[in-house]
Each structure stands twice: as C-alpha cells, then as structure tokens.
C-alpha cells in the first residue's frame, strides 16, 4: 500500500498490446499510484506517485495519435481514483460513438454499477494478483475478465485466457 495520497490519475507509460483484451489491438495506458500492493505484481513500479496527470485532453491526444491502428483503449490501474477512470472512459466511449472499445484493468474486487459499466466500458478485468492462484491464463486464478453487454451486465469470459 502506498502511504501518501495521489489526488489525481497519473500515467507512466503506454503501449500497443495484442493480448490484454481478446480480438482487440489495444492502447494500454499504465496508471501509477496503485494502492493494492499485490505481492509478485509484474508492474510494482506503478505503486509510486510518478508520471504525468492523465487529463481528458491528454487521453484524447494519445488516442488520436493511434487513430486507425487501435480498436480499444484501456486504463491499466487507477484504483486510487475509480470514479475518474470511469468518467474518462465514459467520455472516450461517447466521443468515439462505438468506433473504439474501452477497457479497464483493476486490481480491486468490486464491480461498478450497471449504469457506469454500460456508459464507460466494453471490457473489465478485476481482481488482485495472488501468486498462489496465478494470472488470468491459470484456471485457478481469482482474477476475472468480463465483457460488458449492452445492459451493463458482466459476462465472464476469463476462459479465453486459459491455456
């Protein structure tokens, strides 16, 4: 757990990835200030208060710089300010009016309301990393991958990661 407040969303880096969300070419933006402190986390550097503020303008600029090359934008982390994550992704989803999907990878176990899900997300990955249970490609994992249907309901598709 971090011992200092992180009053805003900050991004450290980003990359184009092909396996975070099945069948998507994703702009994955890594957010810092992670409060979860998962032992064995592959991105422990994201626990610190580092990076630049992720504003709507910056998110839009990053997204537009990859226009035509991506099918999805995902925020990786942001558990220090889930409301801001959902707000930014809702704006992005509305701005692109179905032409670009959105996803969120959260280390928490809670689920946003159906309305928030419907307005903000196409995909949601939930759950802290627990080394004894393995990552998403392990059948024993506690983490879950969901597709958000048009009603805002979560459809568990974790099996798509299993080997």
PLM regions: where:
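N-terminal [4Fe-4S]-dependent radical SAM core
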Residues: 1-30, 35, 43-48
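Conserved nucleotide-cofactor-binding alpha/beta core module
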Residues: 82, 86-93
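Core AdoMet radical
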Residues: 42-54, 68-83, 98-111, 123-148
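Flexible, charged surface loops at secondary-structure boundaries
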Residues: 22-23, 65-69, 119
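Short cysteine-rich clusters marking metal-coordination/redox-active sites
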Residues: 38
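A short, N-terminal amphipathic alpha-helix
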Residues: 58-66
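Charged phosphate-binding loop/patch that engages nucleotide di/tri-phosphates or the phosphate backbone
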Residues: 149-163
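Catalytic cores of alpha/beta
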Residues: 112-118
